[in-house]
Amino acid sequence: YQYSEELAAKTKAKPELVFHGAFEKMAKIKKGRHSVDGNKDFYGGFDQMPEIVPGVKGNSFQFSQDYDHLNITDKIIPSLEWTDPFSLSIWMSTDKRKKGQSQTLIANTGEKNSLWRGWEYYLDDQNRVNLRLINVAPSNLIHVRSVDSLKLNIWHHLTLTVDGSGKTEGVKLYRNGKEIQTEGVIDNLYKTIKPTRPDIEKGFVERKRDIIIGRSYSGFLGDYGLFIGKLDELKFFNGVLTPFEVQSIHSENSEEKEKIKWPVIQKHLVEKDSKILELKKQLKENREEYLKTYAPITEIMVMREMDKARPTYLYNRGNYSEPLYTVEAKVPETLPAMDKDLPKNRLGLSQWLFDPKNPLTARVAVNRYWQMIFGKGLVATPDDFGVQGQLPSHPELLDWLAISFSENWDVKAL
């Protein structure tokens, strides 16, 4: 739109506020369960509960124990799909920063036997803000991370928006009303992120799983991603907040009343235009259809190359604590060299194995078939064609069989 101000009369309200956790009070419902803010679907599931302390607005909850985390049932926030646009904001302050230990803010990811499927919003061991939408870790997911770390022992207003594209570029992270610089760690999501459980007959089936606050379901994190600090004013929206809305929500509980600039308002008006909203609705339907197309496709576990090969070493007598020098991906020098055009990976190795200039593959293969049929190979040491192995009993026959076999690798003809 050339003149965004023309949209002022057409603009719609902010996305639907699905849930507001004020972190004001707790009440015991029964043994081992407490409701939060009078909502039985927002609860603590153990006798340990967070401490109520002053917050940015009224009270906040101080998390400091192993089992003082909170849960939100799917009656409030249903299981999300990566095609679902959503936003959330929360005030937080932490005094924890420990190498190798993350801190879960809010998540519903499972553990290893559930493929870690779900979504998680957390701080890593450098207190960088992270979001992951996961089908199966570590391959089918997106992972976005802030570049800078959060300072300890001060309040931060964190906001997250996800546009439903399933791409890292569709994730925005904000701190105190302003977008922060991020980096895409992994960008490869194309299947569902709804929680799952193993099933003997069906493999994996969809299941309901509460959203968890202040702790992870995943034991592989070592400390279960325990959050140590204070949380306040959690808001969850069904849709994408614009930068204008993010700043507005931040100013509600902030002493900093910064004037919102006109370009931010213009962008907001464009995003809320009825035509734009209708196009986004159609786009969401197309993405859902795309997801349905991929859903029935069965995938199997195979090896894949690393993006960047890690160093490989020759070790002193095989002792992993005593590397002598690095080695490269090559073939034995006593055999024909690998073509320079071949990649130095498993594909290149397979092409080299069946290269007509390589005499070893066909000779070893026909010798093993001879051994399977007659009980003893033409070479009596089938595992050793080197200098310590035995010579072939009928070398000309072995040569003829190997040459004939390598012409088309036809086992039946052999």
Spans of model-derived segments:
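Primarily short, surface-exposed interaction patches in extracytoplasmic proteins
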Residues: 38, 258-413
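Extracellular glycan-associated modules
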Residues: 1-298, 307
